[in-house]
């Protein structure tokens, strides 16, 4: 979880669902990242034996720990790939100043690029697409997805901006409720979420082969 401005952990799950809260900042503050340091600071999700997370804690920010460099970010990602079969980095949209997100985008085997159907997303893409088209970001490995599509929104308009779109993720009221309740990792059980679940399963097959 790369976001150091708005740490995602508080809206992903309840504190009681985490075995022990540890901080990403403790890893990146080290002069060199080691496998043992990563394992020591992983947070295990009690409701899924196959999921562990690394991220900033509630109340922490970019100034809580000493600044880190590209080397620490690269070491973290390389070692994480040796520890776990799949490593997902939740990148921020501010790749110009977020070192971890920038390194993750460059080193990733596959990048899933999400865009909404609103004017803010269009403004962001107009500003940032020239940066993302640079050869160092390897546009060929970027899968494009239009996300949180509501009935009144035209995803086809976003395709005109993005080019070919691999996935179209519909809005789910159940997911929105989980976000508001801080339970985004919870199971989805409502009928209205079926289309959402199918698209997530499609992404899982395409990216991870599972």
Q: What does each of the following model-derived ranges do?
A:
Residues 1-52:
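Phosphate-binding loop that captures ATP/GTP phosphates
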Residues 146-190:
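Beta-strand-loop-alpha "switch" segments that mediate conformational coupling across diverse proteins
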Residues 67-73, 126-152, 187-190:
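P-loop/Walker A phosphate-binding loop and immediately adjacent motor/lid segment at beta-alpha junctions
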Residues 181-210:
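NTP-binding/hydrolysis catalytic cores, primarily Walker-type P-loop NTPases
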Residues 98-118:
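Inter-motif core of Ras-like GTPase G domains
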Residues 55-56, 88-90, 111-117, 143-148:
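Conserved beta-strand segments of the P-loop GTPase G domain that flank and frequently precede/overlap
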Residues 35-47, 55-96:
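Cytosolic-facing regulatory segments adjacent to core modules
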Residues 86, 110, 164-167:
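Well-ordered beta-strand positions
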């Amino acid at each position: 979880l790369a976001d150091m401005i708005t740490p995602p952990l508080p809206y992903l799950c309840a504190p009681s669902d985490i075995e022990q809260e540890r901080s990403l900042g403790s890893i990146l503050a080290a002069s060199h990242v080691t496998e043992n340091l990563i394992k020591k600071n992983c947070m295990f999700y009690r409701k899924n034996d196959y999921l562990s997370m690394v991220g900033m804690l509630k109340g922490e920010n970019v100034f809580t720990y000493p600044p880190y460099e590209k080397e620490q970010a690269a070491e973290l990602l390389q070692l994480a790939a040796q520890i776990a079969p799949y490593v997902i980095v939740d990148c921020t949209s501010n790749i110009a100043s977020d070192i971890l997100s920038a390194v993750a985008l460059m080193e990733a085997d596959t990048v899933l690029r999400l865009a909404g159907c609103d004017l803010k997303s269009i403004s962001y893409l107009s500003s940032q697409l020239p940066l993302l088209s640079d050869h160092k970001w390897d546009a060929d490995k970027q899968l494009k997805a239009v996300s949180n599509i509501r009935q009144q929104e035209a995803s086809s308009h976003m395709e005109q901006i993005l080019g070919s779109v691999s996935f179209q993720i519909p809005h789910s009221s159940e997911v929105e409720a989980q976000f508001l309740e801080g339970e985004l990792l919870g199971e989805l059980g409502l009928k209205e979420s079926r289309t959402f679940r199918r698209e997530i399963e499609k992404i899982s097959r395409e990216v991870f082969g599972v």
